[in-house]
Amino acid sequence: MQLHLKCILIASLYAAGCHQSNTSNTANTTDTVTAITTTEAATVTSNGTTFKKQGTLAFLGKSGADTLRKIDIQLAQTDEQRADGLMYRKSMTDDQGMLFIFPDLEERAFWMKNTYISLDIIYIADNMEIVSIQKYATPLSEESLPSYKKAKYVLEVNGGFCDKYHIAYGDKIAYQQ
């Protein structure tokens, strides 16, 4: 019995010593564990929600030639995925975002109900040009955040992302799955 307890104690100490800690002062980062499959990566954050990498997205300057920033994206393509969005997530890293893909081009409006992190909501036309940005959306707010222009895509990234990386109206995006 004592040998069994010693083995458990040694295994516990070993596991505690293997834990990696993220010491960044950024409020939107967490300790993560990444699992790679043949087609996508899933990042499980410390609060248990899962970010599934389903593609990459590049922010391009107005000319489309200069890459301003690249991020990993999770896609929201079905009605259910678009309705859930980033609800209930407590964190997201700066190199992640969610791209909502709609079947049509029309004015959009998002809200922050059940969304715990501040977001920049980027509205994008069918020609991949950014037509509107709602910056620093207030967590848990039910206020409507309209696009004011027709959009086929909506990208959600951490609040302050657009200011930090100089993303602006007229810039373009390119993404691949």
What residue ranges belong to the model's regions?
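Sec-dependent signal peptide recognition
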Residues: 2-10
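C-terminal motif of bacterial Sec signal peptides marking the signal peptidase cleavage site
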Residues: 15-17
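Compact, glycine-rich, soluble single-domain proteins
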Residues: 19-177
